[in-house]
Amino acid sequence: MVTVQDFFRKFIEFQNSPNEKSLQEIVKLVGQLDLRRFNWVRDVFEDIHVKERGSKTALIWRDINTGEEAKLSYHELSLMSNRVLSTLRKHGLKKGDVVYLMTKVHPMHWAVFLAVIKGGFVMVPSATNLTVAEMKYRFSDLKPSAIISDSLRASVMEEALGSLKVEKFLIDGKRETWNSLEDESSNAEPEDTRGEDVIINYFTSGTTGMPKRVIHTAVSYPVGSITTASIVGVRESDLHLNLSATGWAKFAWSSFFSPLLVGATVVGINYEGKLDTRRYLGEVENLGVTSFCAPPTAWRQFITLDLDQFRFERLRSVVSAGEPLNPEVIKIWKDKFNLTIRDFYGQTETTAMVGNFPFLKVKPGSMGKPHPLYDIRLLDDEGKEITKPYEVGHITVKLNPRPIGLFLGYSDEKKNMESFREGYYYTGDKAYFDEEGYFYFVGRGDDVIKTSDYRVGPFEVESALLEHPAVAEAAVVGVPDTVRWQLVKAYIVLKKGYMPSKELAEEIREKMKTLLSPYKVPRIIEFVDELPKTISGKIRRVELRKREEEKRKKGEVGQNEYVF
């Protein structure tokens, strides 16, 4: 057996000089860990980082809108989280109680994460743009014992509570009947949690249906995040910034566990409203960020800027996650800064599963290779394993042995039966691999377009569309057709300076004919102002398909829609 402390010290060493052989050794050590009694804050954050690098900066925070900023060492962040935990306990919270969290990017968000894990509570991070109705749905599915919010979102949570009586805490300002979080002692004993104890629940934003509640344990994210850290490549010496909303699982992956696993410095930048991309990249430059993670939506916006204004002298690592990043975006960033954006793949239900490791040659358009902690298999519709390159199949995870980063399950048993079948966890996504074992994302199972006898993955068509100079964003869906079953339709957001017209649509189609097989070229193009997205930046193609169904029922055509 290896102790938790020795394991993570070895992992920190590995991160400083990663290679494939050492990664395999790390994976073997995971199997030797005794995690029956495990509290990540006690065993890793405090026993390693606070003790051994307590004076090192753990968090640098800035608010773009207000100009506020803060810097906290590992020791200071530990004291802050202990005060939060003492306060929660004073108000009657105990192990297993449910704490909903809806806050902006703020130092207290990190402190609450630490306090909840240390205290053995069940945390439910929630997106800051959720409505009262959406919060009511969540509260009805999993009743809160306490809610924590900021002054901008408190009213939404309060109204959603209705007649529910719970403890309410505010991270900033004052509000009647709400409590402050830092009134108590900075001494707080850890709860003696077990590895199988539930500590985090997420309601997935989802591209289809109602949100699903995903249940994670005291080890699945806290220890499983070594996969994310090793793919992102974050090191002890890094200033690591992850552009993510606090309610997204990727915040837990990349703003919390991954950098704090290795003793790095986390950078948190808060902004309200629409992302000011120029200003945000200016902060990346001014703060001297060395490791930067952002969703594809942001990267696509970044490359529309005048990139000559930026000098990222310290930036060494850039990664993307959420949906596959289009090769054209990777090329533009590489040409300008000599930095390759490395793509990776994971879910709220897991940690990072497939990725372009720092030591791996990047193939633009590929999401990389599977992490050895996950036994990834592609299965056909009959459940048989696909062994030939370029055949599209369901992305699944072999359950024997069960990966440490995999969630416990859904709260919905029907969904569990659909997803856990015959020894595999079905992700709901489809992909193929090439002759070198690199994986390529095709789409959600229901996103794949069936036109005549062909199957078309939306990502490939969207990537081709982005190569046209007028296209800022694109989403591709299948729309009903009596002859071909479905037609390929492209929704396009134009860059500034371009106006919708049939001539431009024809020009884009002509460009597509040089890049795609004829059956993949969109037969319908509609120009729109924006695309519907989840809180994590994923395109909601299901919403676009619903729009198409409604339009066809009514016999309507879009204002800037062109059929060929």
From Swiss-Prot:
Its main location: membrane. It comes from Metallosphaera sedula (strain ATCC 51363 / DSM 5348 / JCM 9185 / NBRC 15509 / TH2). InterPro entries: AMP-bd_C, AMP-bd_C_sf, AMP-dep_synth/lig_dom, ANL_N_sf, Mitochondrial_ACSM. Coiled coil: none annotated. ATP binds at residues 204-212, 343-348, 429, 444, 538. Its EC number is 6.2.1.40, 6.2.1.1, 6.2.1.2, 6.2.1.17. It catalyses: 4-hydroxybutanoate + ATP + CoA = 4-hydroxybutanoyl-CoA + AMP + diphosphate; acetate + ATP + CoA = acetyl-CoA + AMP + diphosphate; propanoate + ATP + CoA = propanoyl-CoA + AMP + diphosphate; a medium-chain fatty acid + ATP + CoA = a medium-chain fatty acyl-CoA + AMP + diphosphate. Its cofactor is Mg(2+); Mn(2+). The chain crosses the membrane at residues 105-125. Signal peptide: none annotated. Substrate binds at T348, R455. GO terms for biological process: acyl-CoA metabolic process; fatty acid biosynthetic process. The lineage of its organism: Archaea, Thermoproteota, Thermoprotei, Sulfolobales, Sulfolobaceae. Gene3D superfamilies: 3.30.300.30, N-terminal domain of ligase-like (3.40.50.12780). It is an enzyme of class 6 (ligase). The keyword ATP-binding applies. The keyword Nucleotide-binding applies. Pfam families: AMP-binding, AMP-binding_C. It is a single-pass membrane protein. It is found in: Membrane. Keywords: ATP-binding, Fatty acid metabolism, Ligase, Lipid metabolism, Magnesium, Membrane, Nucleotide-binding, Transmembrane, Transmembrane helix. One of its GO terms (molecular function) is acetate-CoA ligase activity. CoA binds at S452, D453, Y454, R484, K513, V521, P522, R523. This is 4-hydroxybutyrate--CoA ligase 1.
